[in-house]
Amino acid sequence: MNFNFELILFYAVLISGIIALFDQLFLMKKRKQVYAKETKGMSNPPELKLPILIDYARSFFPVLLLVFLLRSFLYEPFRIPTGSLEPTLAVGDFILVNKFHYGVRLPVLHTVVYPNNNPKHGDILVFRWPPNPSVNFIKRVIGVPGDKISYIDKTLYVNGQKINQSDIGITNNRDEEGRLWEVKEKMEDFFGVKHAIYINDARYGEDFKDVVVPEDMYFVMGDNRDSSADSRFWGFVPYENIVGKANYVWMSWDSFDHKIRWSRLGKSVN
């Protein structure tokens, strides 16, 4: 079952707001009149107490509304659940995603009301997964509309241009089950965006050639090239599925060693 926090938060704001407004318009005046009659002549009257439901609604509504507006239009926190973007993003990284970088979208409906920047080569994009839009994915933008993408012998080609890779060395990559895999770490220069990638020669990489990215679509891949479910397998990301651009790591928890990765805190995502 997928946990749709955005929808739950929306209903929480709506219900608490309706209760608080109904009380303000119809119940508060009568309650104060009854209180005034009951405490008339008292030198030290007790504090006027609200019904518990109304008290909770009035207390939580402004907080819920503020959180809803911040995460809908400014920044939203996400947790990285898999290693598909390693070594750039580690499992257990908590990141902030800029929600307005690619335009303002209505919460819940996700309709664009104010277009802004379009995704560029090398951007790390959070989006609603096309096969199941209730699930959020995060990948790197490899192809923008009109690009011709090829992937041959684990090397990228964009519009016929080979994307240069330089060797960093051999390292171990741990998967979600804790198993270690020996991988090659390389530095990829992707149109000026330099970032490390993992290549696992023990895993088969299916080649493809001259895949053209359609209008209003994007081709995305993980930096952990042989351990990423991405556009190579399920297709393109439509513009309307975009959630935002990953910006910073604000927390990182190593679930295997049970500790905070202090060195990753505040790291810029690129």
What are these regions (language model features)?
Residues M28-A36, E76, I80:
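Transmembrane helix-loop junctions in multipass membrane proteins, especially transporters and channels
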Residues E76-L85, V126:
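Membrane-bilayer interface helices and TM-boundary transition segments
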Residues N2-K30, E38, P45-L53, P87-N270:
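Soluble "head" domains of membrane/secretory-pathway proteins
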Residues V63, V67, S72, S84, ...:
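Small-side-chain structural scaffolding
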Residues E47-R79, F100:
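Transmembrane alpha-helices and immediately adjacent membrane-cytoplasm interface residues
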